[in-house]
Amino acid sequence: MPTINQLVRKNRKQKKSQSKSPVLEKCPQKQGVCLQVRTMTPKKPNSALRKITRVRLSNGKEVTVYIPGEGHNLQEHSIVLVRGGRVRDLPGVRYQVVRGSRDALGVDGRKQSRSRYGAKK
């Protein structure tokens, strides 16, 4: 416990909260170019081939981005919009592609939560 004198000399420091999506630089989304599109296996106890892509953002930073929904049309040099939002069973994946925007088509045949997947009615 510090004395009053110590607090007068050097006051208490506020803890700064660290951003969960630092490369977006406080923007809601950022545009980027796909460098490679591949799959990744999730942590235990899950088992699948999750679709991911490596993206170079407009600020020059590279991130691993998850492609949500069933099926996609992304390939190398596709332009995508990237938003924050981690995927719990993929370590190191903290961003997601916005479906239905730029080169990423929406999920066709989607009936529920369509706005998340860029699906038309």
UniProtKB/Swiss-Prot annotation:
Keywords: Methylation, Ribonucleoprotein, Ribosomal protein, RNA-binding, rRNA-binding, tRNA-binding. GO terms for molecular function: rRNA binding; structural constituent of ribosome; tRNA binding. Belongs to the universal ribosomal protein uS12 family. GO terms for biological process: translation. GO terms for cellular component: ribosome; small ribosomal subunit. Residues 1-25 are annotated as: Disordered. Gene3D superfamilies: Nucleic acid-binding proteins (2.40.50.140). Residues 9-18 have a biased composition (Basic residues). Part of the 30S ribosomal subunit. Contacts proteins S8 and S17. May interact with IF1 in the 30S initiation complex. It comes from Rhodopirellula baltica (strain DSM 10527 / NCIMB 13988 / SH1). This is Small ribosomal subunit protein uS12. With S4 and S5 plays an important role in translational accuracy. InterPro entries: NA-bd_OB-fold, Ribosomal_uS12, Ribosomal_uS12_bac. The modification 3-methylthioaspartic acid is found at D89.
